[in-house]
Amino acid sequence: MKNLLETNVYDVGETMIIAGTCLKYMQPKAYEELEKMPGEIYEVCLEAIHVNMVITKLIGMLSRVNIKKVIFASVDKSPHCIQLHYIESEITKAMPHLKTEFVHYVALDKALKEIDEKTIKMSKNLGGLQVLLKE
């Protein structure tokens, strides 16, 4: 596993796996699933650094290298790690013509569970969630 922010913007392949630093030791079985996926794993801890630093770094990488797929993976229920899943939205706003595929996973019950874009967007919309829960 490489540190994302310490990686040169040109030193990336076609698939990047970006995982919360704690995933490896908090959910080792789920992390093993990540290790079986094609691509290099990059770690980032959003308790230690601001999400905007990660967004800027990834935009730099995506604008220089033909990255076909970015996978985000985190532990579930972390107020910090959830920000990993918001990065796609910020990147696509800055780079609307980007053709990179984004996939999101959370580690749940010792396994990775894919999370869809609608769920991620709704997690940022507390008012909308409140309405849904009241129905």
Predicted regions and their residues:
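Iron-sulfur-associated redox domains of electron-transfer enzymes in respiratory
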Residues: 1-135
